[in-house]
């Protein structure tokens, strides 16, 4: 696996690089957004770890720009911003997960591995609920044969809901799909991801297909 680390602090960047390499992965380390763009385009990383406090471009702006350019690799954010509002902003920008500073490198590694597990391919199979179609091997959602650009976590939620078409899926079940490691789970993450997912779906399919069932969870149903 190739990991892109975007961090302006040289000591922290080096520490992350060494730890990730010791885990058996290839690492490109960038000190700013310009260098990150280069590695993204030239080396095609599998996942990016992005600090928000970059010298030439705010990390949130970088993530928004990547997502608007259809960059779909998983993004793990490093941030010193601890309020829930800041965390919502990070996820809304297109990040898949975040770690607040100061952090233990073991948590960064665990969250990175969790993201990659969610993003790994499955055996070739398609779930079709016209006009919705989920390609399990490509990890893609299509509506009316048009691919909808989703982040790794958004796709996982959508696949889980479609697999349970017509049945309520609890928030706990979705959290388990996203974070197999219990200590990494934060329930409000689901609400943010669900909001992003609904907006993307409604841009192509205006009818409401994901319903919140109060006190129970979420329901995907075509009417």
From Swiss-Prot:
Annotated compartments = Cytoplasm
| Matching SMART domains | REC, Trans_reg_C
Q: Which UniProt keywords apply?
A: Activator, Cytoplasm, DNA-binding, Phosphoprotein, Repressor, Transcription, Transcription regulation, Two-component regulatory system
Residues annotated as DNA-binding are: 124-222
Q: Any keyword Cytoplasm?
A: yes
Which GO cellular component does the record give, naming just one? Answer: protein-DNA complex
PTM remark:
Phosphorylated by PhoQ.
The name of this protein is Transcriptional regulatory protein PhoP
Q: Which NCBIfam families match?
A: PRK10816.1
What molecular functions are annotated in GO for this chain? phosphorelay response regulator activity; transcription cis-regulatory region binding
Q: What does this protein do?
A: Member of the two-component regulatory system PhoQ/PhoP involved in virulence, adaptation to low Mg(2+) environments and the control of acid resistance genes.
- Lineage in the entry? Bacteria, Pseudomonadati, Pseudomonadota, Gammaproteobacteria, Enterobacterales
Q: Which Pfam families match?
A: Response_reg, Trans_reg_C
- Source species of the chain: Escherichia coli O157:H7
The chain positions of domain Response regulatory read 2-116
Q: Which SUPFAM superfamilies match?
A: CheY-like (SSF52172)
PTM annotation (4-aspartylphosphate): residues: 51
A GO term (biological process) for this protein? regulation of DNA-templated transcription
